[in-house]
Amino acid sequence: MKNNFTTLSIADVCLAIIAMVTITSCTKYDIIGSSDLQGVDGRMIYLRTLTGETPQGIDSCDVVHGKFRFSGALDSVQVVMLCMDNNAMMPIVLEDGKIKVEINAQKIMCGGTPLNDSLTSFTNNYRQLAMQMADLEHTQNQAYMNGEDMDEVNKRLALAERELLIKEDKLVSRFIADNFDNCLGPYVFFMATQAYEYPILTPWIEALMTKATDAFKNNPIIKEYMEAAQHNQDVMTGVADVQQPAMPDVPTHVPTPNDMAKPEK
Protein backbone atom coordinates (compact mmCIF):
# COMPACT_ATOMS: atom_id res chain seq x y z
CA MET A 1 0.00 0.00 0.00
CA LYS A 2 1.36 3.42 -0.90
CA ASN A 3 2.29 5.64 2.04
CA ASN A 4 0.41 8.84 1.27
CA PHE A 5 2.19 10.75 4.01
CA THR A 6 5.42 10.80 2.03
CA THR A 7 3.71 12.79 -0.72
CA LEU A 8 2.91 15.71 1.59
CA SER A 9 5.05 18.78 1.18
CA ILE A 10 6.46 20.76 4.07
CA ALA A 11 3.92 23.47 3.29
CA ASP A 12 1.09 20.93 3.57
CA VAL A 13 2.37 19.77 6.96
CA CYS A 14 2.68 23.34 8.22
CA LEU A 15 -0.86 24.14 7.12
CA ALA A 16 -2.15 21.02 8.86
CA ILE A 17 -0.40 21.96 12.09
CA ILE A 18 -1.81 25.49 11.94
CA ALA A 19 -5.29 24.08 11.36
CA MET A 20 -4.95 21.72 14.32
CA VAL A 21 -3.82 24.54 16.59
CA THR A 22 -6.71 26.70 15.41
CA ILE A 23 -9.26 23.95 16.02
CA THR A 24 -7.85 23.20 19.46
CA SER A 25 -7.85 26.85 20.46
CA CYS A 26 -11.52 27.18 19.44
CA THR A 27 -12.67 24.18 21.47
CA LYS A 28 -14.31 25.53 24.60
CA TYR A 29 -17.49 25.27 26.58
CA ASP A 30 -19.83 28.17 27.30
CA ILE A 31 -22.72 27.58 29.71
CA ILE A 32 -25.32 30.31 30.12
CA GLY A 33 -27.82 29.60 32.88
CA SER A 34 -30.77 31.10 34.67
CA SER A 35 -32.83 30.20 37.73
CA ASP A 36 -35.83 31.73 39.47
CA LEU A 37 -35.68 29.46 42.52
CA GLN A 38 -35.84 31.20 45.87
CA GLY A 39 -32.60 31.52 47.80
CA VAL A 40 -30.36 30.97 44.78
CA ASP A 41 -29.13 34.54 44.32
CA GLY A 42 -25.69 35.15 45.74
CA ARG A 43 -24.88 31.47 46.08
CA MET A 44 -22.04 29.69 44.33
CA ILE A 45 -22.60 26.79 41.97
CA TYR A 46 -20.04 24.32 40.68
CA LEU A 47 -19.24 21.98 37.83
CA ARG A 48 -17.81 18.73 39.18
CA THR A 49 -16.47 15.58 37.59
CA LEU A 50 -18.28 12.27 37.89
CA THR A 51 -15.20 10.10 38.36
CA GLY A 52 -13.40 9.21 41.55
CA GLU A 53 -14.54 8.83 45.12
CA THR A 54 -14.14 12.58 45.61
CA PRO A 55 -15.47 14.48 42.57
CA GLN A 56 -13.14 17.24 41.48
CA GLY A 57 -14.26 20.80 40.83
CA ILE A 58 -13.90 21.96 37.24
CA ASP A 59 -15.40 25.44 37.42
CA SER A 60 -17.49 27.65 39.70
CA CYS A 61 -19.42 30.90 39.57
CA ASP A 62 -21.88 33.02 41.55
CA VAL A 63 -25.57 33.36 40.77
CA VAL A 64 -26.30 37.06 40.26
CA HIS A 65 -29.87 38.24 39.67
CA GLY A 66 -30.83 34.71 38.71
CA LYS A 67 -28.09 34.42 36.09
CA PHE A 68 -24.86 32.43 35.99
CA ARG A 69 -22.23 31.56 33.42
CA PHE A 70 -19.37 29.10 33.02
CA SER A 71 -16.79 29.18 30.25
CA GLY A 72 -13.39 27.66 29.69
CA ALA A 73 -11.14 25.48 27.58
CA LEU A 74 -12.42 22.00 26.79
CA ASP A 75 -9.92 19.17 27.25
CA SER A 76 -12.39 16.38 26.52
CA VAL A 77 -16.12 15.91 26.10
CA GLN A 78 -17.53 14.53 29.35
CA VAL A 79 -20.61 14.45 31.54
CA VAL A 80 -20.25 16.66 34.62
CA MET A 81 -22.60 17.52 37.43
CA LEU A 82 -23.98 20.99 38.14
CA CYS A 83 -23.95 21.31 41.93
CA MET A 84 -24.97 23.79 44.58
CA ASP A 85 -23.06 23.19 47.78
CA ASN A 86 -22.90 19.38 47.96
CA ASN A 87 -26.21 18.85 46.19
CA ALA A 88 -26.24 17.60 42.61
CA MET A 89 -28.74 19.54 40.53
CA MET A 90 -28.42 18.14 37.02
CA PRO A 91 -25.96 16.50 34.61
CA ILE A 92 -24.44 18.57 31.82
CA VAL A 93 -22.39 17.39 28.88
CA LEU A 94 -19.33 19.58 28.72
CA GLU A 95 -18.88 20.00 24.98
CA ASP A 96 -17.98 22.66 22.45
CA GLY A 97 -20.65 25.29 21.90
CA LYS A 98 -23.13 27.45 23.78
CA ILE A 99 -25.03 25.44 26.38
CA LYS A 100 -28.26 26.85 27.80
CA VAL A 101 -29.43 25.85 31.27
CA GLU A 102 -32.77 26.69 32.88
CA ILE A 103 -33.59 25.80 36.48
CA ASN A 104 -37.00 26.74 37.78
CA ALA A 105 -39.94 25.32 39.69
CA GLN A 106 -41.49 23.81 36.56
CA LYS A 107 -38.50 22.23 34.86
CA ILE A 108 -34.78 21.70 34.71
CA MET A 109 -33.50 21.94 31.15
CA CYS A 110 -30.13 21.81 29.44
CA GLY A 111 -29.70 22.17 25.68
CA GLY A 112 -28.14 24.04 22.82
CA THR A 113 -25.54 21.43 21.88
CA PRO A 114 -26.03 17.99 20.29
CA LEU A 115 -25.26 15.75 23.27
CA ASN A 116 -27.08 17.95 25.77
CA ASP A 117 -30.15 18.02 23.54
CA SER A 118 -29.97 14.24 23.28
CA LEU A 119 -29.64 13.74 27.05
CA THR A 120 -32.53 16.11 27.76
CA SER A 121 -34.75 14.30 25.27
CA PHE A 122 -33.93 10.96 26.88
CA THR A 123 -34.61 12.34 30.36
CA ASN A 124 -37.98 13.72 29.28
CA ASN A 125 -38.99 10.40 27.73
CA TYR A 126 -37.90 8.53 30.84
CA ARG A 127 -39.81 10.98 33.03
CA GLN A 128 -42.99 10.28 31.07
CA LEU A 129 -42.64 6.55 31.74
CA ALA A 130 -41.96 7.20 35.42
CA MET A 131 -45.10 9.31 35.67
CA GLN A 132 -47.15 6.55 34.04
CA MET A 133 -45.68 4.09 36.54
CA ALA A 134 -46.66 6.38 39.42
CA ASP A 135 -50.19 6.62 38.01
CA LEU A 136 -50.57 2.85 38.43
CA GLU A 137 -50.30 3.19 42.19
CA HIS A 138 -52.82 6.02 42.14
CA THR A 139 -55.18 3.87 40.07
CA GLN A 140 -54.79 1.00 42.54
CA ASN A 141 -55.59 3.23 45.51
CA GLN A 142 -58.59 4.72 43.72
CA ALA A 143 -59.92 1.26 42.84
CA TYR A 144 -59.62 0.16 46.46
CA MET A 145 -61.55 3.21 47.64
CA ASN A 146 -64.24 2.51 45.02
CA GLY A 147 -64.67 -1.05 46.26
CA GLU A 148 -63.61 -2.69 43.01
CA ASP A 149 -62.52 -6.32 42.69
CA MET A 150 -58.85 -5.93 43.66
CA ASP A 151 -57.83 -9.28 42.20
CA GLU A 152 -58.94 -8.13 38.77
CA VAL A 153 -57.50 -4.65 39.31
CA ASN A 154 -54.11 -6.02 40.38
CA LYS A 155 -53.96 -8.36 37.38
CA ARG A 156 -54.66 -5.46 35.05
CA LEU A 157 -52.14 -3.20 36.77
CA ALA A 158 -49.47 -5.93 36.81
CA LEU A 159 -49.83 -6.27 33.04
CA ALA A 160 -49.62 -2.49 32.59
CA GLU A 161 -46.54 -2.35 34.83
CA ARG A 162 -44.83 -5.09 32.84
CA GLU A 163 -45.49 -3.23 29.60
CA LEU A 164 -44.02 -0.03 31.06
CA LEU A 165 -40.93 -1.88 32.30
CA ILE A 166 -40.41 -3.33 28.82
CA LYS A 167 -40.68 0.16 27.35
CA GLU A 168 -38.21 1.44 29.94
CA ASP A 169 -35.69 -1.30 29.13
CA LYS A 170 -36.01 -0.58 25.41
CA LEU A 171 -35.65 3.17 25.94
CA VAL A 172 -32.52 2.82 28.07
CA SER A 173 -30.94 0.10 25.93
CA ARG A 174 -31.60 1.96 22.67
CA PHE A 175 -30.19 5.22 24.04
CA ILE A 176 -27.03 3.55 25.32
CA ALA A 177 -26.56 1.72 22.00
CA ASP A 178 -27.02 4.97 20.07
CA ASN A 179 -24.30 6.52 22.23
CA PHE A 180 -21.81 3.66 22.55
CA ASP A 181 -18.97 5.83 21.27
CA ASN A 182 -19.51 8.99 23.28
CA CYS A 183 -19.77 9.88 26.96
CA LEU A 184 -23.57 9.46 27.17
CA GLY A 185 -23.52 5.68 26.71
CA PRO A 186 -21.39 4.90 29.79
CA TYR A 187 -23.12 7.63 31.82
CA VAL A 188 -26.65 6.32 31.27
CA PHE A 189 -25.45 2.72 31.70
CA PHE A 190 -24.35 3.57 35.21
CA MET A 191 -27.47 5.57 35.94
CA ALA A 192 -29.42 2.45 35.06
CA THR A 193 -27.27 0.17 37.24
CA GLN A 194 -27.09 2.41 40.31
CA ALA A 195 -30.14 0.67 41.79
CA TYR A 196 -28.33 -2.67 41.90
CA GLU A 197 -26.92 -3.69 45.26
CA TYR A 198 -23.85 -5.08 43.52
CA PRO A 199 -22.74 -5.53 39.89
CA ILE A 200 -24.85 -8.19 38.17
CA LEU A 201 -25.39 -9.44 34.64
CA THR A 202 -29.04 -8.91 33.78
CA PRO A 203 -30.60 -10.01 30.46
CA TRP A 204 -30.70 -6.44 29.14
CA ILE A 205 -27.03 -5.89 30.01
CA GLU A 206 -25.99 -9.15 28.34
CA ALA A 207 -28.03 -8.29 25.24
CA LEU A 208 -26.51 -4.81 25.18
CA MET A 209 -22.94 -6.09 25.40
CA THR A 210 -23.42 -8.48 22.47
CA LYS A 211 -23.70 -5.46 20.16
CA ALA A 212 -21.48 -3.01 22.06
CA THR A 213 -18.58 -1.37 20.26
CA ASP A 214 -14.98 -1.82 21.37
CA ALA A 215 -14.93 1.80 22.54
CA PHE A 216 -17.81 1.09 24.92
CA LYS A 217 -16.46 -2.26 26.12
CA ASN A 218 -13.04 -0.76 26.81
CA ASN A 219 -14.36 2.25 28.69
CA PRO A 220 -12.62 1.89 32.10
CA ILE A 221 -15.83 2.14 34.12
CA ILE A 222 -17.76 -0.25 31.87
CA LYS A 223 -14.89 -2.71 31.86
CA GLU A 224 -14.59 -2.67 35.65
CA TYR A 225 -18.33 -3.13 36.10
CA MET A 226 -18.46 -6.08 33.69
CA GLU A 227 -15.49 -7.78 35.35
CA ALA A 228 -17.11 -7.40 38.77
CA ALA A 229 -20.48 -8.62 37.47
CA GLN A 230 -18.89 -11.63 35.78
CA HIS A 231 -17.02 -12.50 38.97
CA ASN A 232 -20.23 -12.30 40.99
CA GLN A 233 -21.96 -14.60 38.52
CA ASP A 234 -19.06 -17.06 38.71
CA VAL A 235 -19.33 -17.04 42.51
CA MET A 236 -23.06 -17.75 42.38
CA THR A 237 -22.50 -20.67 39.99
CA GLY A 238 -19.60 -22.01 42.05
CA VAL A 239 -16.97 -21.31 39.40
CA ALA A 240 -15.06 -18.75 41.50
CA ASP A 241 -14.31 -18.21 45.17
CA VAL A 242 -16.12 -15.54 47.13
CA GLN A 243 -13.95 -12.49 46.72
CA GLN A 244 -15.90 -9.40 45.78
CA PRO A 245 -14.03 -7.15 43.35
CA ALA A 246 -14.06 -3.45 44.02
CA MET A 247 -17.16 -1.64 42.88
CA PRO A 248 -16.64 0.61 39.86
CA ASP A 249 -15.17 3.94 40.88
CA VAL A 250 -18.35 5.96 40.42
CA PRO A 251 -19.50 8.66 42.85
CA THR A 252 -22.67 8.00 44.80
CA HIS A 253 -24.18 11.40 44.00
CA VAL A 254 -24.92 10.65 40.35
CA PRO A 255 -28.69 10.98 39.82
CA THR A 256 -30.36 7.78 38.68
CA PRO A 257 -33.09 7.83 36.01
CA ASN A 258 -35.66 7.69 38.80
CA ASP A 259 -34.05 10.71 40.48
CA MET A 260 -34.09 12.61 37.20
CA ALA A 261 -37.73 11.67 36.61
CA LYS A 262 -38.95 13.11 39.89
CA PRO A 263 -40.90 16.38 39.58
CA GLU A 264 -38.81 19.40 40.47
CA LYS A 265 -39.55 20.91 43.85
Go through each PLM region and give its residues.
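Amphipathic alpha-helical coiled-coil segments
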Residues: 161-179, 199-204
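Hydrophobic helical h-region of N-terminal Sec-dependent signal peptides
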Residues: 15, 19-20
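C-terminal motif of bacterial Sec signal peptides marking the signal peptidase cleavage site
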Residues: 21-25
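Bacterial N-terminal signal peptides that target proteins for export
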Residues: 2-14
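A non-transmembrane, solvent-exposed segment enriched in polar/low-complexity residues
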Residues: 26-169
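Charged, long alpha-helical assembly modules
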Residues: 177, 184-265
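Short, structured coil/loop segments at alpha-helix boundaries
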Residues: 112-120, 146, 150-154, 181-182, ...
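Phenylalanine-focused residue identity feature
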Residues: 5, 68-70, 122, 175, ...
